Amino acid sequence: MKIRILLCILATLLSYNVSAHDFMVDGVCYNVISEEHKLCEVTFFENESGSVKKNFYKDIVFVPETVEYGGESYYVSVIGGLAFYMQDELLSVVMPGTIRTIKNSAFISCRNIRSIVIPANVTEIESNAFQALESLTYLAVDEGNKVYDSRKGCNAIIETGSNTLLFGCRTTVIPDGVEVIARDAFWTIAPRGNETFSFDIPGSVKVIKENAFSNCEWLSSVTLHEGLEEIGLWAFNGTSIESIVIPKTVKKIEPSAFCNTKLLKSIKVKRGNKVYDSRKGCNAIVESATDCLLQACSTTTIPDGIKIVGEKAFFRIDVKSVVLPASVQEIRKSAFFGSGLQGKLVIPGNVKSIGQFAFTACSGIDELVVEEGCETIGSSAFSLCTSLRRAGLPSSLKRFGVGSVYVLVFDGCDLLENIEIPEQNPYYISNGDAIIERSTMTVVAGTGLGHCQLHIGRKDHRPRKIAKGAFWGMSYMTAVWLPETLEEIEESAFYDCPAIEFIVCGSKVPPLLGKNFGVVNAGPWHLPLQERVVLVVPEGSLDAYKSAPGWSEFRHMVER
């Protein structure tokens, strides 16, 4: 998870205006940033591929006030963007009093850096200047600095005028008087030896901004005090906190504030809070006005009266089963994403809407029953449910795969062998191997185990089109039988189906074939279907297929 996030950040950072060094003095790289004022910045060493050379800087780096270049003397005024990115052998950087600016991600992912002192004349520290510094234990600001401080030896950088804690480390003691904990302030800090740590957030803090403690994997305890008003998006995502008490002064909790907290077992909202509650000892955060369950934990029970299971409410929470009371009407986006649900999942008919990714990656679900009453199922609602074998959908279903140009409701469910929907549904039909939209006779979702037979059953139930991504990620599909009624296969319809050995076409007129309709993206078969499967076409149509766009690329083609 951390690696993926760091890669995403790096991709963003590389779009910033950072460049290789103009010159080097005593092992430190510099760029000239102003000839007129004779100013330069510390920068990174660029390797032959044009990227930052890792571990170029080692031990303690001393940056001087001035350096000589081309017979001229330059003041060192800036620590440049990515200057010390991924310098794992770096222990400390001693910065001179001439430094005015520390740029975006100047110090990021330096695993062994232990101490940083901000000089007195620094007036600007850009966002993400200090991130993922897991060994950092000493963080201070020179007492003469008029913009920033590290009051009371707190081991943090605080913007003095706004009382905003901008950057912290694992030894930070958040001092009373701080009013805001900034975005990414403690992002991915980690102790050595996997020792847990905790934070006591004083009552002066009114706002904890987004990602403030995100991915602090070994943060096991947080104490919130009365006075706190707002908790931002992903604020405590990916931490190891085991319990949380929400003060009665809290007025706003963004979705996913406590997302992906796998060890969380106890949630309580203090009585007297006017916006949120944890009614009936449910071990959850509920938005009182909307009856929306916002955040759950492994011991949550959904109480009667809850109308909405909120976005990411159970995201990666280890729950084996869930009981949805009769009051629940909506399950929102990613509500149970990656949760530990096991066995048969029954979604009662009082649930009218199931959002995108609602049960994605619930690998323990082996049977799905959506009861009569449900009307909408979002795209990827049951994607990557890798144990799912049977799915039953209701006659009340009106909208399937909502929210994406790709339907992908069951993509990656590679053991799925049967999808059923009652004949009386006016919008969709099923032949067991696929769900077909009646109005367009388009396959919107299909099964992936063994032979997929779209050519069987009533002729008026056979499809004319296969939609984008309809069979996406069906790893165990070995053969596809296409009906004589088929007119078009859209792009990526059979994307990442590596086991297909042959395709049997029923139509003498080659259907239109979309771009990348059958590319495999990983494994030994990193080839389009045209390169490796046998295409079987009706007698007398071989020449037509050999000259048709897309079909002509099949290397192995025979007539029946």
Which residues does each predicted region cover?
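Boundary at the C-terminal end of the N-terminal hydrophobic targeting segment
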Residues: V18-D22, G27
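Helix-loop-beta element that forms the nucleotide-linked donor phosphate-binding surface
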Residues: P549-E553
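Structural signature of tandem-repeat unit edges
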Residues: E35-H37, G50-V78, Q87-T101, C110-E124, ...
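Non-globular, low-complexity intrinsically disordered regions
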Residues: E41-T43
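Sec-dependent N-terminal signal peptides
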Residues: R4-L14
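Consensus positions within tandem repeat domains that build extended binding/scaffold surfaces
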Residues: G81-L82, K103-A106, S127-A129, D184-A185, ...
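A structural signal for leucine-rich repeat
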Residues: Q131, Y495, N516-A522
